[in-house]
Amino acid sequence: MSAFRFFRASPLLLGLALLLHPAAGIARAEPAAATAPAPRPDGQHDFDFEFGDWTTHIRRLERPLTGSTSWVEYDGSSIVRKVWGGQANLGEIDVSGPAGRIQGLSLRLYDPATRQWFIRFANSRDGDLGAPMIGGFRDGRGEFYNQETLNGRSIFVRFIFSDVTDRTFALEQAFSADGGKTWEANWIATFKRVQSGA
């Protein structure tokens, strides 16, 4: 599925992605310059940093967009495997805590035509892959956006991959109920690479 087909069904989401992530892959009208802008780099290897085994710690806001400040915590593992030479990857997560266990699968697919990633997530509770998060990386930071419904109201969803090193990275999920003006983080995960022989 191309990004444009997805966004045709959701023009509001397209506008948000363009506004919040300038690398969204659609040219904007700009004043004429003496030289043409450099083409966007191929992002096929944006997730290469994540291949392998990880330990993870997750903080999850129990009731997002309700004013709640009650968080629950989980610890566990994540494994990410390369598919199609890096044009796709599969991530598995298995974490547990006082609030229970979360088992999830992340499928990430790269579209070379738009130079964007499509991230789909399913948990073992219902197996639904859901609508994709769409975006890419710029200067070591990944931003991905989606539009969903939460408790009967339309919201925007944002993933941010940050603090990427050879041994660690962070992932934050946030929701916005006001069209992207403000964001409330509700899933904060830190990852540490499992060292060989450890």
Map each language-model feature to its residues:
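Hydrophobic small-molecule pocket/channel-lining residues, especially in calycin-type beta-barrels
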Residues: R28-A198
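Short, flexible coil/linker elements and helix-boundary hinge sites characteristic
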Residues: M1, H21-P22
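Bacterial N-terminal signal peptides
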Residues: S10-H21
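N-terminal secretory signal peptides that target proteins for export/translocation
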Residues: M1-F7
